[in-house]
Amino acid sequence: MNKLKFWVFNTSLFIFILLILYGIGTGQTLDKEGKMDAQALWRYMTIENPYQNYPTWPGKEGFYESTMPPGNILKLYVNDIALETIVNKKSVFSDGALLIKENYTDGRKLFLITVMYKSKGFNPAGHDWYWVKYKPDGEARLEGKVDACIDCHVGVANNDYVFTGSIK
């Protein structure tokens, strides 16, 4: 039995160290000065941890039609932190939640990728969401405390600024 406990402890310690070394968590979006960085976030969600492998918002699998700007046809991916909030109806997304929305034309051509990333302390007045609008090639068109995003989403502030579905 002692060998089993020893093995479990060492295995757990090894996994923990790997998670720290490889930056699993929320630090991938920060630059060297600790500021939010759209290009670091892009690298994280396209190379280090490709968002196309993330689950989709439950009930929104595949393409679906939007009633809100900026796209008519959408695909919405969420990381595990966001999914836990959605499934367990936690009312507020946790630090590190990542929502990635692919926006398509009516002809299903990708034209924009919009991202909401929850970063504790980033913008308390805006529920700490960091907003980014990327072109499909990864160029950040808008980032940070984007007034256009906040002004649109403030209507659902009681749902942590998210239109897609209730998290309560």
Q: Where do the protein language model's features map onto the residues?
A:
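N-terminal Sec-pathway targeting helices
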Residues: 2-13
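Eukaryotic low-complexity, charged/proline-rich intrinsically disordered regions
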Residues: 71-73, 77
